[in-house]
Amino acid sequence: MQTLSAEEVLELKRRLARLLVEKSYREGDFVLASGRRSDYYFDCRVTALHAEGSWLIGTLFNHMLSEMDIKGVGGMTMGADPLVAATTVISHEQG
């Protein structure tokens, strides 16, 4: 498994943050699932389904999970599906 330095992790987080703002952040008039209104919205699925975003998420998740005794990853379908896929692909890649 690949070990990342603190500097590498910070750079990956910066890249992911930039991509989230570029791909997922929108300003406008939005009605949220709760019925409340907002003048901004993050649709993180757009970033999670983007090739670089998926790679960044998978790499960072694997880094965070590397010190834990984890046997699997999962979550609510739709939102978590791309995150789980990215995490498992990077996990396989890193052995």
Positions of PLM-derived features:
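PRPP-associated nucleotide enzymes
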Residues: M1-G95
